[in-house]
Every structure is written in structure tokens, then in C-alpha cells.
């Protein structure tokens, strides 16, 4: 009996890791500086309107065997803060890509720019992967150069909404999860940094060719529909036609000084504990094409 009580006490005092870790405070919360925008004021349905539903402040997208769905911002931006709170589907979601991203692929087919947050589906018992990516004048053809960094998360993204955001300014791109910076991509030269205006997109689609274990596990439509929910949209920055004096929101307390020491500590924590793939460390990649590494 005494041993049983000790064991139970340890379970209470030392909960298992995985989806229960608490992130360190970044000390600065960019999302709190940007007001929430109604979906209809900022976005339009791009495709799959029959697979999109709006209820109060929640936009639901779903994928089945017939199609997925996507939306696009009404205006292009040349810099800014772009975020949304997203809740993912539990269970078997292999092959499914749920995304929030910036792109100008419709305006520059064949050499577009793109900045991605993608949730790559999984199988029961395994965590989602959050993939961040940056394309510069890449088209999705054989010449495309991806800059992927993949993470697991310190919480279960299927249990509640969490806020994910991209902050893009003339000097750097910062990816945030609940205001914790998880990745920075700095402008070292114009050739490897997106500078042309981009639109904001969200979508759910079948990426079976590559999304889960490099395409080994495909989407299984016995588990359809695959559902993603979005709310708390936050868009603020400089549109393509803003004056040259426009300044986007700052990723840190001190504008133009980079992330604070506390934010860098939070970023280091996230990468040390949850980074599972870094293109710069992949020996199979041709790093002459990624000089930033």
C-alpha cells in the first residue's frame, strides 16, 4: 500500500512529458499588439466553398475525397504580422496538410515567394509535425529550394485552439507559436529573402505524396472528413500600396534590435526540445543553394 501511494504521488508531481510541457515566457507578446479582424473583412474563399463553414467567429474547413478548401486575403502585403488561432483534428490524419501561409504564386507563377506554417497529419499515437518553410522565387518545380524546419509541439494541438503567426519585415521573418518564437530567418541578401508583396492564405488539402513519413503513409478517406478550425485572425502591416513610411509591427520590445534576450531564450528552448528537422543540417541537401546555412 505504501509503495502504491508513493507511485501515485510521483505521477501527480511528475506528469509525463510530451503534450504537457509549459513553455518559458517570451516576455513580449506580439499577438496582443494586433487587433482581431473579422474573416469577411480580410478574406475571401479561394476554393472549396462547399467545404467551408462560418459560425460566429470560427471558420471551419474540411477535406474529403472530393476536395479540400482554402481562403485568401483580400489585400497583398509587403510586410506585417499574420496570425490565426487553429485547432486540428485528432486521430488518423496522415497525408493531410493544414496551413497558414504567405504567397504570391498566383501573381508570379513559376518563380513565386512563399512563407509557410504547415501542420502535417499523422497516425494515432504520434504527434503532428509543424513545418515552417521559406521559398524565394521558387515554383514547386524541380528548381524549387525549400528551407524546411520541422517541429513537434509542447502541447496537443487537437485539444484546443493555439495561436500561430508569421511576422515578416524587411530584415527578418519570425515564426511564433503562442507568441513563443520558434524560428527566425534573417535577410542576409536580397537573393535569398522574399521582398515582393504576398497574400495571406489558409487551406486544408491532400498532400499524401510527401506530408507523412515522406509520403509513405497516405490519406485514408475512411476517416473523412478531415477538419481544421480557424479563428482570431490577426493581420497588420504594410499593404502593397502603403506609403514608404509604413512600419510593420515589431517582433520584439525594441524595434530594429532583433529579438530580446528573453525571447531568444524561449526560441532556444523550443529548438532544443522540439526541432526535429533542419534543412541546414541535412547532409543530402546541396548547401551551395542555401548560403544562409
Curated annotation (Swiss-Prot):
What Gene Ontology cellular component terms go with this record? apoplast; plasma membrane
Q: What happens when the gene is disrupted?
A: Reduced growth, decreased cell wall xyloglucan content and increased aluminum resistance. No visible phenotype under normal growth conditions.
TM spans (from-to): none
Q: How is it modified after translation?
A: Contains at least one intrachain disulfide bond essential for its enzymatic activity.
Q: Which cysteines are joined by disulfide bonds?
A: 238-246, 280-293
**What protein name does the entry list?**
Xyloglucan endotransglucosylase/hydrolase protein 31
Please describe the relationship between pH and activity: Optimum pH is 5 for the XET activity. Optimum pH is 4.5 - 4.75 for the XEH activity.
Q: Which UniProt keywords are listed?
A: Apoplast, Cell membrane, Cell wall, Cell wall biogenesis/degradation, Disulfide bond, Glycosidase, Hydrolase, Membrane, Secreted, Signal, Transferase
Q: Where is this site: Important for catalytic activity?
A: 116
Q: What is its EC number?
A: 2.4.1.207, 3.2.1.151
> What does the UniProt record say this protein does?
Catalyzes xyloglucan endohydrolysis (XEH) and/or endotransglycosylation (XET). Cleaves and religates xyloglucan polymers, an essential constituent of the primary cell wall, and thereby participates in cell wall construction of growing tissues. Involved in the accumulation of hemicelluloses. Has a high XEH activity and only a slight XET activity in vitro, but the main in planta activity seems to be XET, thus controlling aluminum sensitivity. Acceptor preferences are XXXGol = XXFGol > XXLGol > XLLGol = XLFGol.
Against InterPro entries, the record matches this protein to: Beta-glucanase/XTH, ConA-like_dom_sf, GH16, XET_C, XTH
Quote one Gene Ontology molecular function term. xyloglucan:xyloglucosyl transferase activity
Tissue specificity, in the record's words, reads: Predominantly expressed in root. Weakly expressed in influorescence stems. Expressed in root tips and elongation zones, stems, young leaves, flowers and siliques. Expressed in root, hypocotyl, and etiolated whole seedlings.
Secreted among the record's keywords? yes
Amino acid at each position: 500500500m505504501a509503495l502504491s501511494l508513493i507511485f501515485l504521488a510521483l505521477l501527480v508531481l511528475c506528469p509525463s512529458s510530451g503534450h504537457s510541457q509549459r513553455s518559458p515566457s517570451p516576455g513580449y507578446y506580439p499577438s496582443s499588439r494586433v487587433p482581431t479582424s473579422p474573416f469577411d473583412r480580410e478574406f475571401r474563399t479561394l476554393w472549396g466553398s462547399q467545404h467551408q463553414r462560418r459560425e460566429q467567429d470560427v471558420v471551419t474547413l474540411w477535406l474529403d475525397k472530393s476536395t479540400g478548401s482554402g481562403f485568401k486575403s483580400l489585400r497583398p502585403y509587403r510586410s506585417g504580422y499574420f496570425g490565426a488561432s487553429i485547432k486540428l483534428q485528432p486521430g488518423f490524419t496522415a497525408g493531410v496538410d493544414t496551413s497558414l501561409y504567405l504567397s504570391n504564386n498566383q501573381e508570379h507563377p513559376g518563380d513565386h515567394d512563399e512563407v509557410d506554417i504547415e501542420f502535417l497529419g499523422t497516425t494515432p499515437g504520434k504527434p503532428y509535425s509543424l513545418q515552417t518553410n521559406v521559398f524565394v522565387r521558387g515554383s514547386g518545380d524541380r528548381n524549387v529550394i525549400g528551407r524546411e524546419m520541422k517541429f513537434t509541439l509542447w502541447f496537443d494541438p487537437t485539444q484546443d485552439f493555439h495561436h500561430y503567426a508569421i511576422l515578416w519585415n524587411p530584415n527578418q521573418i519570425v515564426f511564433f507559436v503562442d507568441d513563443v518564437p520558434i524560428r527566425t530567418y534573417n535577410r542576409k541578401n536580397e537573393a535569398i529573402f522574399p521582398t515582393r508583396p504576398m497574400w495571406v492564405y489558409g487551406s486544408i488539402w491532400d498532400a499524401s505524396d510527401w506530408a507523412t513519413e515522406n509520403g509513405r503513409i497516405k490519406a485514408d478517406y475512411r476517416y473523412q472528413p478531415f477538419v481544421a478550425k480557424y479563428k482570431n485572425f490577426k493581420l497588420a502591416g504594410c499593404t502593397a500600396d502603403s506609403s514608404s513610411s509604413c512600419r510593420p509591427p515589431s517582433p520584439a520590445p525594441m524595434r530594429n534590435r532583433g529579438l530580446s534576450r528573453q525571447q531568444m531564450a524561449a526560441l532556444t528552448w523550443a529548438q532544443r526540445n522540439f526541432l526535429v528537422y533542419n534543412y541546414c543540417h541535412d547532409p543530402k541537401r546541396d548547401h551551395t543553394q542555401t548560403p544562409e546555412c
